[in-house]
Amino acid sequence: YRMALQTREQHIKREKATSNICTAQALLATMAGFYAVYHGQEGIKNIAKRIHSITTWLNKALTRLGYVQHNELFFDTLRFSLPDHVSAQKLRTIALSKEVNLRYYDNGDVGFSIDETTDLKDVNLLLSIFSIAAEETVQEVTDIPEASSLNRELRRRTSFLTHEVFNKYHTETEMMRYIKRLERKDISLAHSMISLGSCTMKLNAASEMLPLSNLGWMAIHPLAPEDQTKGYQTLINNLSEQLKVITGFAGITLQPNSGAAGEYTGLRIIRAYLESIGQGHRNKILIPASAHGTNPASAIQCGYTTVTCACDDKGNVDVEDLRAKAEANKDDLAALMITYPSTHGIFEPEIAEICKIIHKCGAQVYMDGANMNAQVGLTNPGTIGADVCHLNLHKTFASPHGG
């Protein structure tokens, strides 16, 4: 975990890397790390006990109402079959009237999960929904006693988060000062030019960060019903159409949540396309020596082997070496992975010719879009001749940096 954050091994090992973490993913890892630092072992235990106590209490309360709970071993998730006089549709109607979404299984069961945000108001709301559906009267709960239904053998006996850093910063002020000390060790655009990737957006303006804490954007559940996410659907569709125009491509997917995930997705799309036209045997990826380490790492993780083509003394791709490597491997070549402009900030003058060389071999061109901001307004991947491209969330979409 620490090595992944500090060195991102694909920079060093390239095609020999065993991981491929992107800055956008590192942000989530950093947030999880700070969460553990702030709460420490005792804080994490208390949160877990609270969650499990609420779940245990609800299990007993709903069982008394006639619901049958099916998870023999549980921590935070319960699944109930309904009494004969209660239908899933009846329960759903009552829940929706109180603006609550439950999980509805295909066989008629109903379930829900508890987390650290669940409070007494939520408990009473759930109790109300299930009691009304069962046509029973219950009293409002004012306190949840600590309780556990876990078997003794499942309870952890060893210590964790024992390092000093997890046992020092448990107040807001201490945490703020700790994060500030770490920040002072870093280099950013507030200090100087950043040598790697400086042609990309490395500064996120405050206006771009505001939606992160806007209640109109955040807290939507990934499994929320379609009729409750119409605004998101409009946003996704509009963004997809705009990106089609910007990139010159025919289709867009917004599912990958980082550059590394985007690379993996793009290469899988290329593989699926080649298989669909009877070329599934192609298993080699051509990659310039100047490429970002994530490119060969992604190729290997997708099951490809890599072939490296040379660059000249100015950092440009050696077109003749690329042509020779492509020709030598044309029967097995699946794709070229190329960054435009390159990681060194160079606009390859022969990019269109490079794409033509690859296409003549029956292969596809994957363009790493890490530096997309440097070409917008001048050209786009579709015009250049690329077939697939990813756009980084922490650059093009200005999500916070994790590295």
Which residue stretches match the model-derived regions?
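Conserved PLP-enzyme active-site core in the AAT-like
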Residues: L62-T63, R79-F80, T93, G231, ...
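Conserved PLP-binding catalytic core of the aspartate aminotransferase-like
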Residues: L65-I94, I114-T117
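Gly-rich Lys/Arg/Thr-decorated short loops/hinges at beta-loop-alpha junctions or inter-strand turns
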Residues: V37-G43, H70-F74, R155-R156, S213-D227, ...
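Flexible inter-domain linker/hinge segments
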Residues: L120-S195, C199-S207, L212-M218
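Conserved N-terminal alpha-helix of the aminotransferase class I/II PLP-enzyme fold
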Residues: T171, G216-N257, G262
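Noncatalytic alpha-helical scaffolds and linker/capping helices
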Residues: I94-S97, Y105-I132, E136
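Conserved phosphate/anionic-ligand binding catalytic regions in large, soluble enzymes, centered on
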Residues: T23-L28, S113, I187-S207, Q255-G266, ...
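Active-site C-terminal subdomain of aminotransferase-like
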Residues: Y1-A61, L65, H70-E72, V388-G403
